[in-house]
Structure formats: C-alpha cells, structure tokens
C-alpha cells in the first residue's frame, strides 16, 4: 500500500472547499465573526464527513472506477478495498466525536448527513436522478450545518439553495461524462435512461436556475464583496449553454462548474464580511 493513497482517497482539495463552505454558512448566519473555536470545529466536522464519504464511495465504486478512473487508489492497487472501508468508518467516527463538541443539534445533523453519504454510496448513487439530487442535498446541507453550528440559519439558506441547484447540474454533467463506463457496468444513470441530449437539457435548466438564485442574497442586503458572483454566473451560463448545444462537452462543463463553485464561495464570504449589519 502507498501511504500517500490514504490522503489521496480523501480528495482533500474537495473536502477543504466543503469545510470552507461550512464556515461560510456560519459567517452568513451569524452576521459577524463567530468564535474561532466553533469555526474550526465546523470545518473539521464537514471535512471528515466529506473525506469519509469520498473514501466509502471509492469502496463501493471499485468496479466502475476500473473503467472510468483507473488511476484512483483502489483500482491501481495503492490501497486495499478492505483498508479503504475501515479508513472511511474511522473518519466518520472522528467527525462525529468532533460534532459532539458543537452540541446535540450539530451532532444529530452531522449523524444524519454522514448516514446519507454512506447510503448514497451503497444504494442511491446508481439510481437515475435520485443519486444526483442526494449529492446536491448533501452539498446544500454544508452551509446549513455551519449555521446550525452557531445556533441560527438566517442567510445561509440562500447559499444552500444555490449550492443545491448548481450541484444537481454538475452531477448530471458528470453522469453524461461517465456514460460509456456506466453503461458497460449496467448502471441506471439519468443519461443512460433518457439519453445524453435530454440530460444535457435538464443540466442546463438547473444551471440557469442557479444563476437566477444567485441574485437572492442581493435582495437581503449582502455586501459589495459579493460582486465576483457575476463571473460565476458567466461561467455557469457558458457551461450550461455548452452542454445544451453539445452534451459531449459535459466533462469540460462540470469542471467549469467546479471552479465556479470555488469562486462563488469566495464571493459569498466577501459579501458576508462586507455586509452592513
């Protein structure tokens, strides 16, 4: 086994981004700077939930990854499947212990979200559209968790709406990208069930709904630091139009949405910090 595989299988860059979104949810909801120790705990709970979910996902997805992503740790033999499973369970356990430090509401929320990540990887992922929506719900739950961690929801709900919509779009694009491998293994993803073209239309609809939803925070007085969201909207529009015209561009489109999400996180953070309370 390769020691670096234990880091790689977590996909830390994705988990760091998720942790930042959790912190952002707390900042937006708190209308100020929450206690630093709470922000650290929120980040860690989200990080370990994300990393555990990624690890368990690779455990269940090993056959598909042999075709679609052969360079991932398990298919290339860098870590055994059994070791990956127990490693994922360990990460869940660490995250839940940390969640207890935030209180029972935060613990129960984390427990529910963690359970959903496991069930998604185990049973829900192959189901057409249901799997996509589940991932989007988990992503939307991230800023809400940050808000729960500081004891209020407030504006974090708007961030959750945007996160949900853009991730439904991205998950469908990823399924279009993985069409051949999924079809060979008998998966029942949305593109396989209704075709790439119709799936591209649905992905683009959710993309444009994200753009519309991105204006909701303006209505409630988010700060001028939110202006970079214009760049995000342009990127989402491009990805949505591309996949609408040519579904074969879904792979490029989902990467654009991933980068756009990163910029959106920064935009929401700056907007929250520059808002007049």
Curated annotation (Swiss-Prot):
Enzyme class: transferase
Reactions mediated catalytically: sn-3-O-(geranylgeranyl)glycerol 1-phosphate + (2E,6E,10E)-geranylgeranyl diphosphate = 2,3-bis-O-(geranylgeranyl)-sn-glycerol 1-phosphate + diphosphate
Pathway per the UniProt entry: Membrane lipid metabolism; glycerophospholipid metabolism
BP term (GO), one: glycerophospholipid biosynthetic process
CDD domains: PT_UbiA_DGGGPS
Pfam families (UniProt xref): UbiA
UniProt entry tagged with the keyword NAD: no
Name of the protein: Digeranylgeranylglyceryl phosphate synthase
Signal peptide start and end residues: none
Subcellular location: Cell membrane
Function: Prenyltransferase that catalyzes the transfer of the geranylgeranyl moiety of geranylgeranyl diphosphate (GGPP) to the C2 hydroxyl of (S)-3-O-geranylgeranylglyceryl phosphate (GGGP). This reaction is the second ether-bond-formation step in the biosynthesis of archaeal membrane lipids.
CC per GO annotation: plasma membrane
Cofactor: Mg(2+)
Record's bilayer topology term: Multi-pass membrane protein
Keyword Transmembrane in record: yes
Transmembrane segments: 16-36, 40-60, 93-113, 129-149, 153-173, 199-218, 222-244, 253-273
InterPro entries to which the protein is assigned, alphabetical: DGGGP_synth (IPR023547), Prenyltransferase_related (IPR050475), UbiA_prenyltransferase (IPR000537), UbiA_sf (IPR044878)
Entry's family note: Belongs to the UbiA prenyltransferase family. DGGGP synthase subfamily.
This enzyme's EC code(s): 2.5.1.42
Record keywords: Cell membrane, Lipid biosynthesis, Lipid metabolism, Magnesium, Membrane, Phospholipid biosynthesis, Phospholipid metabolism, Transferase, Transmembrane, Transmembrane helix
Gene Ontology molecular-function annotations: geranylgeranylglycerol-phosphate geranylgeranyltransferase activity; magnesium ion binding
């Amino acid at each position: 086994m390769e020691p670096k595989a234990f880091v790689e299988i977590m996909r830390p860059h994705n988990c760091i981004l998720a942790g930042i979104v959790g912190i952002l949810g707390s900042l937006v909801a708190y209308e100020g700077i929450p206690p630093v120790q709470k922000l650290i705990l929120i980040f860690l709970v989200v990080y370990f939930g994300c990393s555990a979910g990624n690890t368990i996902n690779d455990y269940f997805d090993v056959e598909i990854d042999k075709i679609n992503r052969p360079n991932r740790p398990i298919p290339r033999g860098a870590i055994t499947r059994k070791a990956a499973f127990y490693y994922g369970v360990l990460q869940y356990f660490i995250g839940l212990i940390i969640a207890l430090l935030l209180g029972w509401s935060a613990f129960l929320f984390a427990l529910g979200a963690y359970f959903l990540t496991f069930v998604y990887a185990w049973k829900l992922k192959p189901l057409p559209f249901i799997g996509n929506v589940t991932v989007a719900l988990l992503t939307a739950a991230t800023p809400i968790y940050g808000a729960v961690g500081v004891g209020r929801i407030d504006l974090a709900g708007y961030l959750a709406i945007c996160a949900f919509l853009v991730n439904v779009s991205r998950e469908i694009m990823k399924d279009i990208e993985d069409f051949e491998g999924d079809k060979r293994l008998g998966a029942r993803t949305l593109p396989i069930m209704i075709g790439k073209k119709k799936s591209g239309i649905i992905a683009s609809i959710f993309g444009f709904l994200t753009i519309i939803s991105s204006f909701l925070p303006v209505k409630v007085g988010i700060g001028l630091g939110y202006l970079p969201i214009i760049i995000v909207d342009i990127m989402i529009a491009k990805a949505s139009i591309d996949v609408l015209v040519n579904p074969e561009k879904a792979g490029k489109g989902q990467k654009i949405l991933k980068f756009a999400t990163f910029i959106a996180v920064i935009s929401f953070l700056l907007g929250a910090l520059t808002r007049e309370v």
